[in-house]
């Protein structure tokens, strides 16, 4: 296959999406069969917590864990035990350059992880490796497929390209999981003009995980890691539980800093549903990153007040789902990275009096705030 972009064709976005979560208690409906239990609509809600047409999952992104497990499960029974296996190759580093007719170069560097679910039980039970795809072969395949991509593609497209190859080329492979982290190389600008072949290393990383089953069933998750943001005002923390262990003072004026990790799932269940636009995934990644940043900071002149990291996190997640109907769910992890006020005193005098000006940065220990937001279909 010479052009990975040829994988995709036009189709409308599926509208049905009904994830499960730790705070949406469910049970199989009375009419559900064993086969039905893989479907979200085979379950009936017992308790649902709604947040403006979304459902909020706190602490654990259970819906993604369940969906991922359903997509990539290959369990068998051995001697009265349940056995599940997979094998793959991790941290395969590959860089690719594309050149256009105007002499502009385009560059990506990826770290690729591959995991195959396959029918190779004899390798474990009797030492028969005849059904094993060697991990060195997987590594080589990454470079072969990168060479075959004549046109510039996204990390998501390359992950789909690889996963589709493994599930179609090897009869014993039932599913492939491809995880890619893209190193943040950015084009250099000299005197305001983009350099044709010059790049510098940025900060936050573009991530993706793709699961492809032999049947063609698909799951795509994209994300961002290392998005460091900070504002020096318009943040506070009040009204929290106070007990004999509490020494933290309440405040309406503090610095707020975090390193955002976000992952979002697309609703596409098959290749035919993915938009054919070549730059679709890259543009959506940049759009979502911009939305997260804008919501965190607010307007350039006024900003926006944050009463807690939790409140800001929900606003950020909700704005992504409101703006982008092609995002089914989003998970955010936002540690509260502390800048502690500095007050220094000796026995006789105060050396430094804090006036919202001198801080001691520290990231250990730090607060840990994580939640996810998913679309639901209300039956009300």
Give the positions of each predicted feature:
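PEST-like, low-complexity acidic/proline-rich intrinsically disordered segments
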Residues: 1-9, 61-73
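N-terminal intrinsically disordered, cationic/polar leader segments
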Residues: 8, 69-290, 294-380
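Serine residues within intrinsically disordered or low-complexity segments
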Residues: 9-12, 18-21, 29-31, 63
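Short linear/disordered segments characteristic of secreted peptide precursors
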Residues: 20-22, 33, 53-54, 58
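Short, low-complexity intrinsically disordered segments enriched in A/P/G/S/L with frequent Arg
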Residues: 31, 41-42
